[in-house]
Amino acid sequence: MGEINQVAVEKYLEENPQFAKEYFDRKLRVEVLGEIFKNSQVPVQSSMSFSELTQVEESALCLELLWTVQEEGGTPEQGVHRALQRLAHLLQADRCSMFLCRSRNGIPEVASRLLDVTPTSKFEDNLVGPDKEVVFPLDIGIVGWAAHTKKTHNVPDVKKNSHFSDFMDKQTGYVTKNLLATPIVVGKEVLAVIMAVNKVNASEFSKQDEEVFSKYLNFVSIILRLHHTSYMYNIESRRSQILMWSANKVFEELTDVERQFHKALYTVRSYLNCERYSIGLLDMTKEKEFYDEWPIKLGEVEPYKGPKTPDGREVNFYKIIDYILHGKEEIKVIPTPPADHWTLISGLPTYVAENGFICNMMNAPADEYFTFQKGPVDETGWVIKNVLSLPIVNKKEDIVGVATFYNRKDGKPFDEHDEYITETLTQFLGWSLLNTDTYDKMNKLENRKDIAQEMLMNQTKATPEEIKSILKFQEKLNVDVIDDCEEKQLVAILKEDLPDPRSAELYEFRFSDFPLTEHGLIKCGIRLFFEINVVEKFKVPVEVLTRWMYTVRKGYRAVTYHNWRHGFNVGQTMFTLLMTGRLKKYYTDLEAFAMLAAAFCHDIDHRGTNNLYQMKSTSPLARLHGSSILERHHLEYSKTLLQDESLNIFQNLNKRQFETVIHLFEVAIIATDLALYFKKRTMFQKIVDACEQMQTEEEAIKYVTVDPTKKEIIMAMMMTACDLSAITKPWEVQSQVALMVANEFWEQGDLERTVLQQQPIPMMDRNKRDELPKLQVGFIDFVCTFVYKEFSRFHKEITPMLSGLQNNRVEWKSLADEYDAKMKVIEEEAKKQEGGAEKAAEDSGGGDDKKSKTCLML
């Protein structure tokens, strides 16, 4: 073969272009050129400079990255990883990294996503999983500072830079000398920070490196922008779906908050991007009932010292609804959840309810402030990783519940966009409560209207003619208009016509209303107010007092037992306890005035049926009042009367005195609910025990009077003693009253059987009337004995009530024993007859040959 020279080679290549193309493609690839310049020992005879070769590399890499950008199916991290590999090669950097920027709880932060990328490293080795992220705020490190300033930072010597943090170096053992960091910015939002670390064969990155770095990161920016745009589209799409479906469901349900929340939350579950979420509903009670505060005021129960909502309510989750979306979908409802339930034990829902903050936590089990359960929370084996908790706030800015979301489906921690979506949902749910609140208010107004109409149709206040029948000013003063009379004249006329309290036995515990007419009882009631000296002291106009008393009488319906006679008897017993029983010494004249008036009103407008019947029949009263239904109605009726100036016997009191009267009305009338009796009797017993140990009467009076709570407890028990006082009357009175009570119960039982289609309890079953004595003995033993036994210990003057009770028990026990003996004889006779019939059947059956009871053998 001849000698090969340059001219021959050029001629051959020109004549064979295909060969030339394949040859140069093979020999002048980017990697080969790079290796030539990296290896200084390889001799290269060429006029092409390093910069020219770098431009060749850049052009080839740009083409490769363009293909990467348009590839489908890959993750953005994969595209960025390829770019960082090439960038590390071009810049001669030891390694490159990417930190993503995000916000949690309103605080921006950066999190490692790709770490230590080299030209030859694998994607799987560089990708940082959600559970291994290194997260730090923007005020730590040069990366955070680059995200904060949104500028490129070329740091020749990190030790001389005040923003440098050696946290990562300490974690990895790597030594950072110099670095180049650039943020990827979209508008005003920083998506990520790209960092090149430690220039190889040089002490720092040059200006030319910065230019290449900036130019090359345009491709990274495009990749991240595309991903960000897609992600934001997904966010807005999910948000719009949540709003649309929530609006659809909350307007389907207006009557119940729990059902309203459940419908909305269950419908939008697929758009929430989490494995599980729970809703904790808060008790909205702002003030305790007075009888629940008594143990606290007496020092028997420690005051509540736990967390409270911003509006002052105790943080009490009365129900938790747990939505499980991983594995098999399931919904768990936990009424009255215990404090150690896994959703509450961490303390996070309580913290959110107390402060109203949004709490977004990554790696929740490692948190030091909240104690999340580190292992599986239930039988499914599911564990908590990341948590996002938000308050549900209504239009009044009251926190009504707490929504907590667990474990984002892609394993990443919840970010600001998840906060945005869930906050949209919880805000909408909170605002939608306006619908249920409005519906509830309208419903209550409708019920109040129905009740008011019923009251007006059934009762009206006393007419002028009815007042004249008691206050006989026309007859005695020959005056046609009462306004023409002086108050002193009216007082004299009224007192003259009122019965004598001694002859009417108004001071006696044995008082019986049977000899008196209902009209006469009105006069007796007025007399009692004069006897406690409140008419003159509080300047009560006698016309108003007469009208009020007559109207109260008309307010009682003509039912079998809970009628005006019962109302008067309770008022008379209250008077007797105060005066004859000497309990008045614990109360002021104003308090005694209010107690006596409340006693007369305590059962006004009673319907002859109890609270349970109101609930069973879903009456307007039951829909209006949640507890102590009838008692609250009696209270509202009484307060309604006082709103009419012509009926307001307290019209001359000042504002503070009137508020005291209304409060005492509330305590006294609500206390007649026997369902509350067992709550208050132990507290009363302790007061009696304490007074028994005291040496003087003055000491006992001081012990009671200095504490308003003790006075209220005694007053509440006095109302119970008054309400049950018929059981202490002489036998000839008590036996008749008991039959009236029983008849009213039987009438309710008839209603339950016919109207409600339900079987009444034995006490209200007319078919079991013969068991009345036995029921009376049980009622005396279980309910009544304690009341009068304790009052007899408290004040010996009240012993006649206990004696009357014990005498009546003997009578009822005797009747009960007679009934039991009679029933025993009947049962024995029935057994004898049954035994005789069986023996006769055996005799007629021919020995052991038994006949079938269902078949006839022919």
Swiss-Prot record:
Effect of residue 29 to W: In COD4 and ACHM5; severely decreases cGMP phosphodiesterase activity
Reaction equation(s) it catalyzes: 3',5'-cyclic GMP + H2O = GMP + H(+)
Domain GAF: 75-224, 256-433
Single Gene Ontology MF annotation: cGMP binding
InterPro entries (UniProt xref): GAF, GAF-like_dom_sf, HD/PDEase_dom, PDEase, PDEase_catalytic_dom, PDEase_catalytic_dom_sf, PDEase_CS
Active site: 562 (proton donor)
Positions annotated to bind a divalent metal cation 1: 566, 602-603, 723
Residue stretches of biased makeup (Basic and acidic residues): 830-852
Enzyme superclass (EC): hydrolase
Outcome when changing residue 602 to L: In ACHM5; severely decreases cGMP phosphodiesterase activity
Cysteine methyl ester sites (modified residues): 855
Localization terms from the record: Cell membrane
SMART domains xrefs: GAF (SM00065), HDc (SM00471)
GO terms under biological process: cAMP-mediated signaling; phototransduction, visible light; retinal cone cell development; visual perception
A Pfam family the protein falls into: GAF
Cofactor(s) in the UniProt record: a divalent metal cation
Cofactor binding comment, as recorded: Binds 2 divalent metal cations per subunit. Site 1 may preferentially bind zinc ions, while site 2 has a preference for magnesium and/or manganese ions.
Record propeptide residues: 856-858
One Gene Ontology cellular component: plasma membrane
Oligomer status and interactors: Composed of two alpha' subunits that are associated with 3 smaller proteins of 11, 13, and 15 kDa.
Biological role: As cone-specific cGMP phosphodiesterase, it plays an essential role in light detection and cone phototransduction by rapidly decreasing intracellular levels of cGMP.
Linked pathology: Cone dystrophy 4: An early-onset cone dystrophy. Cone dystrophies are retinal dystrophies characterized by progressive degeneration of the cone photoreceptors with preservation of rod function, as indicated by electroretinogram. However, some rod involvement may be present in some cone dystrophies, particularly at late stage. Affected individuals suffer from photophobia, loss of visual acuity, color vision and central visual field. Another sign is the absence of macular lesions for many years.
Protein name in the entry: Cone cGMP-specific 3',5'-cyclic phosphodiesterase subunit alpha'
Gene source species: Homo sapiens
